[in-house]
């Protein structure tokens, strides 16, 4: 069966459609939706059956953890094990935006949701649809890219439909995404004051370094 495609306004998401998306997530469905970089696959990260479905849909290796979309720095600290001034610095400068921050996970997430790493990758997207979903849901949602393992990432809903439209029940069409580059990833899980840039993406490395070394 092909996925249902639901149009949602990218800047002013219709509340009734956000409610529908949230109801699907609460049922354990996998939902493809736009972020500010690529389209992503959203599920409730506490629902381990839904998390498992994402790995099956993408043919993704089980040791690779899924990043999470959140709505605020406060939500980040609800999910992180420790407070860290470096999180504050990066969030103040780059959130909402295409920056993923890896931290040690707290007790709110099942270990399996971290791919048994004990770490969690978080970001606040600069996109109204996923932020509205997270705020209405009251929990983070997963944000792994909505494509098959090894295939190109999708910046529009038709690409998602063509790649995995027969594997998921719902695709949110919010138009093209704002970037054609992945997020920049910074690892803060290494210990107090320690950090590593794992991937340069939409935010250049030198901008990250300037913030972390000030």
Predicted regions located by residue number:
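Active-site-adjacent structural elements in enzyme catalytic cores
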Residues: 1-214
């Amino acid at each position: 069966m092909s996925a249902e495609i639901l149009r949602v306004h990218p800047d002013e998401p219709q509340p009734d459609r956000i409610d529908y998306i949230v109801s699907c997530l609460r049922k354990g469905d996998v939902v493809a939706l736009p972020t500010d970089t690529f389209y992503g696959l959203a599920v409730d990260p506490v629902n381990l059956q839904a998390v498992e479905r994402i790995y099956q849909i993408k043919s993704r290796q089980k040791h690779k953890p899924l990043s999470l979309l959140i709505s605020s720095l406060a939500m980040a600290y609800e999910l992180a094990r420790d407070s860290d001034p470096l999180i504050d610095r990066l969030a103040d400068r780059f959130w909402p935006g295409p920056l993923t921050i890896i931290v040690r996970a707290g007790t709110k997430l099942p270990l399996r949701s971290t791919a048994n790493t004990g770490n969690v990758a978080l970001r606040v997207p600069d996109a109204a649809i996923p932020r509205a979903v997270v705020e209405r849901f009251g929990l983070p949602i997963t944000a792994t890219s909505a494509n098959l393992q090894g295939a190109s990432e999708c910046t529009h809903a038709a690409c998602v439909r063509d790649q995995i439209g027969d594997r998921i029940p719902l695709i949110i069409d919010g138009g093209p995404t704002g970037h054609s580059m992945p997020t920049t990833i910074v690892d803060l899980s290494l210990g107090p004051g320690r950090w590593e840039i794992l991937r340069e993406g939409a935010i250049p490395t030198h901008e990250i370094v300037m913030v972390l070394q000030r």
